[in-house]
Amino acid sequence: MQKLIVFFTTIAAAQAFLLPSGGGGGCGCAPPPPPPPCGCGAPALPPLQLPRFELPRLSLPSLGGGCGGPAPCAAAPIAAPAGGYATAPAAPVGGYATGPAFGGAAPIGGAYQAAPAFVGAAPVGGAYQSGPAFGGAAPAGGAYQSGPAFGGAAPAGGAYQSGPAFGGAAPAVGGAYQAGQAAVESAPLGGAAPAGGYQASAPAAVEAAPAAGGYQAAAPAGGAYAGHKKN
């Protein structure tokens, strides 16, 4: 009888230590089985699960392995300056007049109304109403009403009403053109404009103006036509 008791006790002890219990730790590497669905057996603690332990992957970006951070070309954008980007320089205190289109100097005491198109000099005390088209000099104390088209010199004390079309010299002090000259025609050399002005057009090149009076169309050197030729 005692041998049977010792035998069953040994078997029960072996089952308790070697066989996995319902929810206990168990031995070996196999995970513990789930608890019984009906709640049978003794209560046991839930299985303790530890996080997986992995060594970090070490690799050099130049050797092509791993995820070595952002690419060297993906640099951050350059931040804007503290005051922002300027869009245009500030205007002067008195504002812009109109200004020459290509490098012309600003007037000292006056202002441009239209400004010369190509590097015309600014007037010192006056102003252009239209301005010469190509490099005409500014008048000293007067002003152009239209201005010569190509490089005509400014009058000393008078003004053009239309101005010569191509490079004509300015009239002498005190005179003025009523209509102006045709293309490539110059003003009289050394002669003052007639007292009454030209009615239609200036005389041809190198022809002197009459001392007094005016042309009706184009008179000879010293007189005028009245409908027939003088003897």
From Swiss-Prot:
Component of the insoluble part of the cuticles. Tyrosine residues can be cross-linked in vitro, leading to the formation of insoluble high molecular-weight complexes. One of its GO terms (molecular function) is structural constituent of cuticle. The small repeats A-A-P-[AVI] are also present in many proteins constituting the protective envelope of other species. Residues 75-221 are annotated as: 12 X 4 AA repeats of A-A-P-[AVI]. It comes from the Eukaryota. Sequence repeats lie at residues 75-78, 79-82, 90-93, 105-108, 114-117, 121-124, 137-140, 153-156, 169-172, 192-195, 208-211, 218-221. Keywords: Cuticle, Repeat, Secreted, Signal. This is Cuticlin 2. It is found in: Secreted. Residues 1-16 form the signal peptide. The keyword Secreted applies. One of its GO terms (cellular component) is cortical layer of collagen and cuticulin-based cuticle extracellular matrix.
